[in-house]
Amino acid sequence: MESMLVAGAGAAAVAAVGGLVAAAALADKLVAAPPPRKNRANPPPAVPGLPIIGNLHQLKEKKPHQTFAKWSETYGPIYTIKTGASPVVVLNSTEVAKEAMIDKFSSISTRKLPKAMSVLTRKSMVAISDYGDYQKMAKRNIMIGMLGFNAQKQFRGTRERMISNVLSTLHKLVSLDPHSPLNFRDVYINELFSLSLIQSLGEDVSSVYVEEFGREISKDEIFDVLVHEMMMCAVEADWRDYFPYLSWLPNKSFDTIVSTTEFRRDAIMNALIKKQKERIARGEARASYIDFLLEAERSAQLTDDQLMLLLSESILAAADTVLVTTEWTMYEIAKNPDKQELLYQEIREACGGEAVTEDDLPRLPYLNAVFHETLRLHSPVPVLPPRFVHDDTTLAGYDIAAGTQMMINVYACHMDEKVWESPGEWSPERFLGEGFEVADRYKTMAFGAGRRTCAGSLQAMNIACVAVARLVQELEWRLREGDGDKEDTMQFTALKLDPLHVHLKPRGRM
């Protein structure tokens, strides 16, 4: 979910440049903008920009995390940029990021969302709602009902079936055409989406009647609307976010796209919820997030709208972040046959001829290192969702004024040569030294830190690690010829631009 939020924030910055023609033409209106606050005694260094637009023109390459990291080489781990009328403090080191997320959390606990995300999420989803009573209640519910340790135990069988289905499909495709590369993403995302539906709604929905559409829609269309269209809408941008004093100007194309996406998402989610409420009314209780939320005591805490948004978030998150992590891991494994062999031998020694399960994970240190190294090099969230400084505070010795936006550049934290040797290389061995603990999720910033740590970190590790282990245990992986340098990402997200195509060879029985 958070990768979608970051995509939206980055996209808005780029699209704002396109809106500068209108802004420049209406420069006489700029006097309506509120005067900036008086500079504090010791502000962070500022990246030089242009009048009115600030640094927006420098972010047009659509990889803001890389631009931010480059600037940190000149201006240090903390600096200020201007995105139109908005000052933004960018943090580029783990040390400063943890200071903000843990030590200074009370001053920097709210979210600052672009217009598209405010409309789509209504600030009711766990990942982006402001810290407070509602956010704590919603996070507690998703931890107890779906993502926490005990909840994950009850969904374990579902996860195991999902991974077995992936392997069964891959074996079938290889047997039909052993010499052609196959598209791993197509196979994996289909089963991953089924898992997210079962966990969230209690069943792998094949179709649902949507009253607003006047027809039955298929599972593929459900996926397109709830996952694909939501991701694409997140990169739609409203330049008015960066020029709030011009908010009275129309942006009809943006408003149409967002409202259409919102309408379609709401219609399908409400149809899915209606179907499950009818099941529950018949006394057919199941282990699922919706069954948990609809229990009387918890149901009274939520409006129908909040229920719909929380379930939408749970479906999207499972089908997004885990895909990014697993696909990049298998890309690196296929690209590095020596490391693939090390992992395979570890699995053989630890598990013999038995299929890897979640119980085996503590006995597979190299597998855990592979997982953490992939999170470091290919973080699902290159830049964490923007936060809002609501009280004057200090960071790294600099004064930060209330009203400032703050962005944490996870990419720069993970590419810091002062912390990571040869950070551009994929080297799981770096996580096997004395300085690293497998259980320490804060060695990378991929799951955030402090009170806003990602709620889905345990599920991501359970699914990705077992999937990777089983995939290597049963199949030998080799990249399609010419794909060894295809490491670009899709727009502002961490999703691999080119779906992973691989040659697979079944291994002999162990």
Curated annotation (Swiss-Prot):
Q: Which UniProt keywords apply?
A: Heme, Host-virus interaction, Iron, Membrane, Metal-binding, Monooxygenase, NADP, Oxidoreductase, Transmembrane, Transmembrane helix
Q: What SUPFAM superfamilies would the database entry show?
A: Cytochrome P450
Self-association and partners: Interacts with the rice dwarf virus (RDV) P2 protein.
* EC numbers: 1.14.14.70, 1.14.14.68
UniProt family annotation: Belongs to the cytochrome P450 family.
Q: How does it sit in the membrane?
A: Single-pass membrane protein
Key word Cell inner membrane present: no
* Pfam families named in the record: p450
Localisation per UniProt entry? Membrane
Q: Where, in this chain's numbering, is heme bound?
A: 454
What's its job? Catalyzes the hydroxylation of ent-sandaracopimaradiene at the C3alpha position to produce ent-3beta-hydroxy-sandaracopimaradiene, an intermediates for the biosynthesis of oryzalexin D and oryzalexin E phytoalexins. Catalyzes the hydroxylation of ent-cassadiene at the C3alpha position to produce 3alpha-hydroxy-ent-cassadiene, which may be an intermediate for the biosynthesis of phytocassane phytoalexins. Catalyzes the hydroxylation of syn-pimaradiene (9-beta-pimara-7,15-diene) at the C3beta position to produce 3-beta-syn-pimaradiene.
On the tree of life, the source organism's domain of life is Eukaryota
- Kindly list the residue ranges recorded as spanning the membrane: 4-24
Gene Ontology MF: a single term = iron ion binding
- Tissue specificity, please? Expressed in leaf blades and sheaths, stems and panicles.
Q: Name one GO cellular component term.
A: chloroplast outer membrane
Q: What cofactor does its activity depend on? A: heme
Q: Which GO terms describe its biological process?
A: diterpene phytoalexin biosynthetic process; ent-kaurene oxidation to kaurenoic acid; gibberellin biosynthetic process
Put simply, this protein is called: Ent-sandaracopimaradiene 3-hydroxylase
Q: What induces it?
A: By N-acetylchitooligosaccharide elicitor and methyl jasmonate.
Q: Which top EC class is given?
A: oxidoreductase
